[in-house]
């Protein structure tokens, strides 16, 4: 979200974010409640982070609805989760996640423009466009190795983590609110 920090479009007003894929497996930990399964705690975090990072705020209100089209597979956990977030600034986000639907996008509408990313999470890079005609292309190579190297450098050199554990805690607070 380095792009969002530098945008001339004003404040985020409306966000639409989705992360999901079709998972045909029928016996996997992601379908087991005791093991932390469910789309929200896995792919839903990507949709959630898109909204959180676009606004720079933590949500103050959550409304959610889960559904399952394959109850024979997803009888303990949700296959799909739709959730709406409200932020202190008044910005609203409509987020979706699923193990039954392929989706991978983020659109942020600002006071004076928009940003679209599709895909907004991918191992091979993220692409998008802005209302001013700017094209966004962030190629990624082996991002997990890069993050592990940066984490090790932070520990060895007493520098702040690029993605500190507190970010995960913020995500989990919202994930838990979605499930309530």
Please state what every model-predicted region is.
Residues 1-73:
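Predominantly a Rossmann-like dinucleotide-binding segment in NAD(P)-dependent oxidoreductases
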Residues 16-25, 121-126, 141:
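Mobile beta-alpha loop/short-helix "lid" or hinge segments that flank ligand
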Residues 17-19, 64, 97, 119, ...:
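Active-site donor-binding loop signature of nucleotide-sugar glycosyltransferases
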Residues 28-29, 127-131:
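Short, basic/glycine-rich phosphate-binding loops at helix/coil junctions
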Residues 42, 48-124, 145-159:
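Contiguous beta-strand/loop segments that form the cofactor/metal-binding neighborhood of enzyme cores
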Residues 35-42, 134-142:
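A short glycine-threonine-serine/GTX helix/turn-capping micro-motif
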Residues 136, 151-180:
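C-terminal helix-rich "cap/oligomerization" subdomain common to oxidoreductases
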């Amino acid at each position: 979200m380095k792009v969002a920090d530098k945008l001339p479009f004003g404040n985020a007003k409306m966000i639409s974010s989705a992360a999901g894929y079709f998972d045909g497996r029928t016996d996997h930990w992601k379908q087991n409640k005791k093991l932390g399964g469910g789309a929200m705690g896995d792919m839903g975090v990507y949709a959630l982070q898109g909204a959180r990072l676009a606004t720079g705020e933590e949500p103050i209100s959550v409304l959610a609805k889960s559904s399952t089209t394959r109850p024979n597979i997803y009888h303990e956990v949700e296959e799909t989760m739709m959730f709406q977030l409200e932020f202190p600034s008044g910005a609203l986000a409509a987020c979706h996640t699923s193990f039954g639907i392929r989706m991978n996008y983020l659109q942020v509408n600002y006071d004076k423009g928009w940003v679209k990313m599709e895909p907004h999470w991918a191992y091979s890079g993220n692409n998008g466009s802005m209302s001013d005609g700017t094209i966004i292309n962030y190629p990624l190579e082996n991002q997990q190795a890069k993050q592990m190297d940066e984490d090790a450098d932070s520990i060895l050199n007493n520098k702040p983590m690029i993605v500190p554990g507190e970010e995960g805690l913020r995500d989990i607070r919202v994930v838990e609110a979605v499930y309530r």
